[in-house]
């Protein structure tokens, strides 16, 4: 059975002349193939982690640092940073990466929404991803975090190359609306009691 959180939006990028996968919030992707992983980030964060020696790399796209149920257990949903980072690293190792070779590049965490709580989410995501990687000894080779603009990211997992474009437009309603809707949903999940034996997918 395919993990529903594993990105499956494949396309061919004409400009970059390569196979590509677009990641949506709550998705991740790991590959050994010569391709590009792309996403658009507002207050969300993406970690691009790879082993340059083994040629294995992957990326995630998470919206909030952590989600816990009423028992204090981590909600297994890749829209939350704790699980998104854990599963990304686990899949990298399962596909042949070596932990001592892993390095990262991180992006996002922008203050693109009007509400103060949304600005806090971007900063919280930024602090979380830096702390997570530091605690696990995974160096951050490059980072572009926070700020006031959304970002479009193209990550080449075979060699770690990243292309970033900041979206300097006056109205980013699609990105903002999507993140607001997901943020409300995730905050509701994190704060409500989840019945024992159930899982958020």
Swiss-Prot record:
Q: What GO molecular function terms would the record report?
A: protein-glutamine glutaminase activity
Q: Which Pfam families match?
A: CheD
Please give the InterPro entries that the UniProt record associates with this protein: CheD-like_sf, Chemorcpt_Glu_NH3ase_CheD, Cytotoxic_necrot_fac-like_cat
Keyword set includes Hydrolase: yes
Keyword set includes Hydrolase? yes
Q: Which residues cross the membrane?
A: none
The record's EC number reads: 3.5.1.44
Similarity annotation: Belongs to the CheD family.
Q: What does this protein do?
A: Probably deamidates glutamine residues to glutamate on methyl-accepting chemotaxis receptors (MCPs), playing an important role in chemotaxis.
| Protein name in UniProt | Probable chemoreceptor glutamine deamidase CheD
This chain's source organism reads: Nitrosomonas europaea (strain ATCC 19718 / CIP 103999 / KCTC 2705 / NBRC 14298)
């Amino acid at each position: 059975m395919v993990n529903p959180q594993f990105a499956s939006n494949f396309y061919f990028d004409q400009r970059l002349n390569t196979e590509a996968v677009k990641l949506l919030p709550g998705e991740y992707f790991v590959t050994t193939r010569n391709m590009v992983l792309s996403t658009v980030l507002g207050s969300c964060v993406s970690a691009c982690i790879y082993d340059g020696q083994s040629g294995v790399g992957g990326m995630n796209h998470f919206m909030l640092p952590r989600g816990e149920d009423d028992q204090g257990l981590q909600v297994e949903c890749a829209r939350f940073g704790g699980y998104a980072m854990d599963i990304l690293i686990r899949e990298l190792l399962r596909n042949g990466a070596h932990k001592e070779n892993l390095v990262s590049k991180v992006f996002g965490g922008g203050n693109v929404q009007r509400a103060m709580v949304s600005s806090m989410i971007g900063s919280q995501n930024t602090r979380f991803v830096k702390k997570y990687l530091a605690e696990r000894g995974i160096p951050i080779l490059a980072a572009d975090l926070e700020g006031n603009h959304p970002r479009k990211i193209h990550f080449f997992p075979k060699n770690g190359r990243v292309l970033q474009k900041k979206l300097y437009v006056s109205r980013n309603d699609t990105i903002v609306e999507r993140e607001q809707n997901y943020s409300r949903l995730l905050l509701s999940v994190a704060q409500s009691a989840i019945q024992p034996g159930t899982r958020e997918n």
